[in-house]
Amino acid sequence: AAMEEQLGLNKPFFVRYFDWVLGCLHGDFGISYVNPKRTVAGELLRCLPATLQLAGTSFVIVAVLSIPIGFLCAVYKDGWFDKIMRGLVFVTTAMPAYWVGLLLMWGIGVKLNWLPTNGNGTWRHLILPSFTVALSYISTYIRLIRNNMLENMKQDYVLYANVRGLPQKAILVKHILKNSMHTCIVAMGMSIPQLISGTIV
């Protein structure tokens, strides 16, 4: 009874809800049901460094892998690399992140024993969870960059650049890829809150 009174569970649901909303407006998110001696805000602050580290590492992995892969898929459209990557993108998009995480833990962590499956503190502990979180985003941005580049390749400025005699590498990187990155950068920026909220440790 004392615990119910401390947590406010003896009040009607709507009263508890409005008390919680009013508390949130003042920065008070209530008391943790898991550990009543701690506040929810305190628990969030305690987990924030690890959460930001995981989200930041995942974001770097997304950028480092999706941009060059999407670029190569567009340049070598319908080639063997493009077909393989499109197949992998289709498979990874269809697989939920928790299932991918379990497969990676079982294969890389348990069977091969290359990386730790739990714990925190070193860069090796970040690889599996970061890659698991990043995988679905990588698939999304590979498709986005590839499609944007293929669309930009049809634009008039590419024809003019070829007429001017610019090197093909310069046209691809300085013009097509640069113009294709605008929507991708916006999408990546919009996915940061989702990335952080989805990686709360």
Question: Where are the predicted features?
Answer:
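Hydrophobic alpha-helical transmembrane segments of membrane transport/permease proteins
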Residues: 1-18, 34, 112-128
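Short amphipathic alpha-helical coupling elements at transmembrane boundaries
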Residues: 2-5, 19, 23, 42, ...
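Alpha-helical transmembrane segments of integral membrane proteins
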Residues: 46-81, 120-201
